Amino acid sequence: MWDLALIFLAAACVFSLGVTLWVICSHFFTVHIPAAVGHPVKLRVLHCIFQLLLTWGMIFEKLRICSMPQFFCFMQDLPPLKYDPDVVVTDFRFGTIPVKLYQPKASTCTLKPGIVYYHGGGGVMGSLKTHHGICSRLCKESDSVVLAVGYRKLPKHKFPVPVRDCLVATIHFLKSLDAYGVDPARVVVCGDSFGGAIAAVVCQQLVDRPDLPRIRAQILIYAILQALDLQTPSFQQRKNIPLLTWSFICYFFFQNLDFSSSWQEVIMKGAHLPAEVWEKYRKWLGPENIPERFKERGYQLKPHEPMNEAAYLEVSVVLDVMCSPLIAEDDIVSQLPETCIVSCEYDALRDNSLLYKKRLEDLGVPVTWHHMEDGFHGVLRTIDMSFLHFPCSMRILSALVQFVKGL
């Protein structure tokens, strides 16, 4: 009996070691870390840990133990939360939607700005716990009331469930600002990555709601703003740079939007949409809208291939503005509030921010733009990661705080 147990334990150890070595080798063969990225060794370690969790999640999914998103979320939520004595944190629900409310402990009679925060993670990972440190710091340093929304996500809930959850939670919050001591003239929606996309959509959805306090500003941190064109300069230049590599981008898009993975090459070549659609949106998505300095390194303009009709029938949801807020009509975008956009140089989604910035500015919407020359996608999440912390994360937080204080 004991011999059998020892054999099983040894086999498990060898298998675990093999998985770890495979992840490390795969990292060095497939991932590119530019010299200009701050702390490249840290980034390699962070990406290997990230990939190891994804790989084990995939293994457990194949063994039908649990899904990859469930495993990843379980692991990411294991570390205990650190509470700041100057911030009061309250957990409750708007109906079935869990939220965390962060309020400065020092009581005053004056109303404070309110920030509704939607966490990132591609609808796959991320949670109220993973973004607790960000929201707590944002609350304390900007002297604001922060509401973090715990929307439903994969594997059970796909697009547009996360967006609808966040919209419902935001409306609940806007209808009860007095209860939280929030100034109705200073409500901000904010999100990073997938959460940035949600912030953009929520803002657009609320422009025609005169029954609610008007959103004062939106903060979009390396946001996913369109799902049409995956051949922008940044996609070509940065698709092998962690943490958002091409393989994870595909997983995120195909799982959230419920596409068949067989369309990957078709979408890459732009053959998933008809010529008239590309022509219609060229004025907003064309590379001429991106400053020349961002096209100097490894960009090649590629014509879109003829449409694959079967692919178009399945993936046309990318034309929904709840999926691609960047292509909303002018009469909506022109009504949007003051905007703060944060982009990172080493991010495949960088150009989403640049294109939306131009759209907003062309329509007269004030934009504050912060571009992190040494930043990468997901860097803000490292703000509380001790030895894996990147200084760039503090600069992003500082930019957000100054923006909120200036409203």
UniProtKB/Swiss-Prot annotation:
Highest taxon in the source lineage: Eukaryota
The keyword Cell membrane is assigned to this record: no
Coiled-coil residues: none
Keyword Hydrolase: yes
Name of protein: Arylacetamide deacetylase-like 3
Keywords, alphabetical: Hydrolase
Similarity comment text for this entry: Belongs to the 'GDXG' lipolytic enzyme family.
Motif (Involved in the stabilization of the negatively charged intermediate by the formation of the oxyanion hole): 119-121
Enzyme Commission numbers on file: 3.1.1.-
Natural source organism: Homo sapiens
MF term (GO), any: carboxylic ester hydrolase activity
Encoding gene (name): AADACL3
Record's GO cellular component terms: membrane
Signal peptide: none
Active site: S193, D347, H377
A Pfam short name: Abhydrolase_3
